[in-house]
Each structure stands twice: as C-alpha cells, then as structure tokens.
Regions:
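Short alpha-helix capping/helix-loop boundary micro-motifs
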Residues: 51-55
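Hot-dog-fold acyl-thioester-processing enzymes
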Residues: 1-50, 104-119
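HotDog/MaoC-like acyl-thioester-processing domains
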Residues: 1-4, 56, 61-62, 73-119
Length: 119
C-alpha cells in the first residue's frame, strides 16, 4: 500500500479526551478513498456506498503526523472496492484500517451506471 496523503493533527481535530476525533478521521478517509477511486476510474461521478467494519487500533494526538493509503480490492460492473489504512508516520503504527470501502459510479439521476473498466 502506498501512503500518499499526510495530515498534521491539530487541536481542532481532537475529541474531549485530547485524541484524534474518530469522525474527523473518517471524513479524511472518505475523501482520500474518493480521490483514489476517481483516479482509478477517471470518473468523477461516484458515491460512497458502504464501509466495512471500522476498528480503531490506536490513536493520535496533537503534533502527530498521520498518513493515509488506499489500495484496490476489486472492480464490479458499477462499483469499485478499495481498502484504506491510516498510520502514524513516525512509528508506522496502524491507527485504523478499513478492509472494504465500496464506491459506485452514478449517472446524472444518481442511479448506478457501468464505469467501463473490466478487470
């Protein structure tokens, strides 16, 4: 897996315990995974359909640098499934891994449409 995006954890990214807020991390993951999928399909009209079980393995605090990576799992007729991992850049410790994030190509009416990639 290639780690392409990095984020510096700032105070506004934290929860009440002083660690990275999970909702913020999921927002970043969805954005990173969407960009990765758009680059695979060369198609911008996609939506997030599903994410598999989400387990937070460790956390991050102010000043930590995290990095996010995605890799292709499979192509469907209208969908693409990828996995994503977020880890601490310095320690390489996994913070979260999502094994399956499913994106679907949609037409102008929001209906699934073939993305045209056959693999």
């Amino acid at each position: 897996m290639k780690f392409r995006t990095r984020k510096l954890i700032k105070p506004e990214d934290l929860n009440a315990r002083g660690t990275l807020f999970g909702g913020q991390m999921l927002k970043w993951i969805d954005e990173e995974a969407s960009i990765f999928t758009i680059c695979q399909l060369k198609e911008r009209s996609i939506v997030t359909k599903a994410m598999s079980e989400i387990n937070f393995v460790s956390s991050a605090k102010t000043g930590d640098i995290i990095e996010m990576g995605c890799e292709l799992v499979q192509f469907g007729r209208t969908s693409v499934t990828i996995s994503c991992e977020v880890r601490n850049k310095d320690t390489k410790q996994t913070i979260i891994r999502i094994d399956k994030i499913v994106f679907v190509a949609v037409d102008e009416n929001g209906k699934p449409t073939p993305h045209g990639i056959i693999k």
